[in-house]
């Protein structure tokens, strides 16, 4: 048994008041630059349960707060959305060297690859209907009702867009290792062309896209994952991010490999009770590509400076940044 398994076993025996608990089959799950992710079996009291450990890495692609992610899991699992059940949050680094949390594993499921031209095959329409409906239910939820009204973010519907631009402009300023003229041009355009005020302030998932949810063999979405960037904001932020071309496997007419764009928007509008006004959504789509570029700029720096040498950071800093620079250049050129 590895040292991590031994320490995890000791922690869970105390946390769950289960002196007979044993940890087995602990294995690192590849990917995930903001948290180290492991799966394992916890056996105690006649149970054999699959669990997931999410531990802070020595360095992170983006600065995220594990308490935020855990609370989002709690809130939306409690609301009945397909979200894993959270089990334990530990901010004390002593048990496992770094803060971490534990949640249930959703078994016998897969994710869709953003590199595949048809990631969901015959289930694409069924999955798409669920995907945009779940996103809409997140948008429709009142942050006060789900206990997340104190989340980070701007609560003024007139100021929320510029708040998010400033947030990601700061990331670019802190992490760029070489000039980023296209990104800077996008920031200027977003500032000079503000969108209409937000219709409401919602909990924004922050990374709602293909690759961040699990589906079973029957095409049912079983879990929405990776809530570490969740915050308060304009619900159109999630919609703009979800339909970004990067997640479309080369088929921009089928965002995320699921539904045609117009149908996706209709599903979201119907389920959320909100409107994706074209001018506002266009602004948030350009913002989405800026946000992506800022994240990939951070990835490149983390990898180049040796703080996080996960290959996903090298890929993101190379391919994804170039992709979003091209998207931004095309979109800004079309607006000229």
Name what the model sees in each region:
Residues 1-20:
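Juxta-kinase regulatory segment immediately upstream of eukaryotic protein kinase catalytic domains
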Residues 27-185, 189, 193-200, 219:
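ATP-binding pocket architecture of kinase catalytic cores
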